[in-house]
UniProtKB/Swiss-Prot annotation:
EC id: 1.3.1.93
Annotated catalysed reactions: a very-long-chain 2,3-saturated fatty acyl-CoA + NADP(+) = a very-long-chain (2E)-enoyl-CoA + NADPH + H(+); octadecanoyl-CoA + NADP(+) = (2E)-octadecenoyl-CoA + NADPH + H(+); (2E)-eicosenoyl-CoA + NADPH + H(+) = eicosanoyl-CoA + NADP(+); (2E)-docosenoyl-CoA + NADPH + H(+) = docosanoyl-CoA + NADP(+)
Protein name (Swiss-Prot/TrEMBL): Very-long-chain enoyl-CoA reductase
Pathway(s) the chain acts in: Lipid metabolism; fatty acid biosynthesis
Gene Ontology, cellular component aspect: endoplasmic reticulum; endoplasmic reticulum membrane; mitochondrion
Subcellular location: Endoplasmic reticulum membrane
Origin: domain of life: Eukaryota
Organism: Saccharomyces cerevisiae (strain ATCC 204508 / S288c) (Baker's yeast)
Keywords recorded for this protein, A-Z: Endoplasmic reticulum, Fatty acid biosynthesis, Fatty acid metabolism, Lipid biosynthesis, Lipid metabolism, Membrane, NADP, Oxidoreductase, Transmembrane, Transmembrane helix
PROSITE patterns: S5A_REDUCTASE
Membrane topology per record: Multi-pass membrane protein
C-alpha cells in the first residue's frame, strides 16, 4: 500500500512509503531524509490534510495505527534548526554576560565619574545586591536548562533565536543601566515611606522573599520533570496531562507564579527601577497569557498569581 508524500518546498523531493510495512514516524522521516540528500529530520515538517487544514504528524505510531492510502501527506523544509536546550541556554546566558559587563564597569571609578547619572547617588552596595540576585536567578535557569528541563520539541528554526533572545539580552539587560543610576524615578525618602507602610523596609526581608520564590520555582520545575518522566514511563510521551496535587491545585502554572514573584521582590530591592518594572510587566503579561492557555486546555480555572483571587 504505497503512498506518496508530496513536497511543499522547492528543495525537497516527493517520497514514496509503503504503509503495509507499518513504519514508525521515525522510519518515515529517515526515508524522507535519505531521499533528500540526508537532510536533518528535524528540518522536516510532516503533515496530513484534514478538512483543508495541514495537521502535523507527531505520534510515533501514526503510520501504524491511523494512516491509510486515502490520506494526503506533505513535507516542508523548516530551514536550519537549533536545539531547544541550546536556545534556552543562549537566552539565559545573555543576562549573565550583559550584567557582568555593566556591573564590572560600574566598579571602575573613572567609568563611574564619566557615565553615572547626575540625578542619582552612586550606590555600590545596591549594585552588588542586584547583580548577585540577577546572577543567582539566571544561574539557576542555566542549571535547570542543562539538567532539569525536558523539551516537547527537539528543535526550532535557528533564525527565531534572535527574537527569543531579545527578551533576555535586551529587556533584562536594560536593568543593568541601573548600576549607573539610570531609571530610578523615586527618591529614597518617598520610596521607603511606602516600604515601611507595607512592612517591607528591611532589605534582608526582600532578599529572603526573592530567594524563597526562587526555591519554590525550582521545586515546581523538579516536580514537573518528575511528572513528565512518570508520564513517559507509562507510555504517555506526547499528550500533556496536568499535575493535580499540592500547589499545582492552587495555581495553573506555579512555576510562572513564583517566577513573577521573584521579579516583584527584585523590583522592590532595586527601588522600582523603571527598567526592572518594564521587564516585570512584559514577563508577567507573557506568562499570564501562557497560564490562561493552560487553563483553557485543561478546562480549569486555577489562579495565576494569588490563590482564589487572580
Amino acid at each position: 500500500m504505497p503512498i506518496t508524500i508530496k513536497s511543499r518546498s522547492k528543495g525537497l523531493r516527493d517520497t514514496e512509503i509503503d504503509l503495509s510495512k507499518k513504519p514508525t514516524l521515525d522510519d518515515v522521516l529517515k526515508k524522507i531524509s535519505a531521499n533528500n540528500h540526508n537532510i536533518s529530520k528535524y528540518r522536516i515538517r510532516l503533515t496530513y490534510k484534514k478538512e483543508s487544514k495541514q495537521v502535523p504528524v507527531i505520534s510515533e505510531s501514526f503510520f501504524q495505527e491511523e494512516a491509510d492510502d486515502s490520506m494526503e501527506f506533505f513535507i516542508k523544509d523548516l530551514g536550519p534548526q537549533i536545539s531547544w536546550r541550546l536556545v534556552f541556554f543562549c537566552e539565559y546566558l545573555g543576562p549573565v554576560l550583559v550584567h557582568s559587563l555593566f556591573y564590572y564597569l560600574s566598579t571602575i571609578p573613572t567609568v563611574v565619574d564619566r557615565w553615572h547619572s547626575a540625578s542619582s547617588d552612586y550606590n555600590p552596595f545596591l549594585n552588588r545586591v542586584a547583580y548577585f540576585l540577577i546572577l543567582g536567578h539566571y544561574g539557576k535557569r542555566l542549571f535547570e536548562t542543562l539538567f532539569v528541563h525536558q523539551f516537547s520539541l527537539a528543535t526550532m528554526p535557528i533564525f527565531n533565536l534572535f527574537k527569543n533572545c531579545f527578551h533576555y539580552w535586551v529587556l533584562s539587560g536594560l536593568i543593568s543601566f541601573g548600576y549607573f543610576g539610570y531609571g530610578f524615578p523615586f527618591g529614597n525618602a518617598k520610596l521607603f515611606k511606602y516600604y515601611s507602610y507595607l512592612k517591607l523596609d528591611d532589605l534582608s526581608t526582600l532578599i529572603g522573599l526573592f530567594v524563597l520564590s526562587e526555591l519554590w520555582n525550582f521545586y515546581c520545575h523538579i516536580k514537573l520533570r518528575l511528572w513528565g518522566d512518570y508520564q513517559k514511563k507509562h507510555g504517555n510521551a506526547k499528550i500533556r496531562v496536568p499535575l493535580n496535587q499540592g500547589i499545582f491545585n492552587l495555581f495553573v502554572a506555579p512555576n510562572y507564579t513564583f517566577e513573577v514573584w521573584s521579579w516583584i521582590w527584585f523590583t522592590f530591592v532595586f527601588k522600582f527601577n523603571l527598567f526592572a518594572v518594564l521587564f516585570l510587566t512584559v514577563s508577567t503579561a507573557q506568562m499570564y497569557a501562557w497560564a490562561q492557555k493552560k487553563n483553557k486546555k485543561y478546562h480549569t480555572r486555577r489562579a495565576f498569581l494569588i490563590p482564589f483571587v487572580f
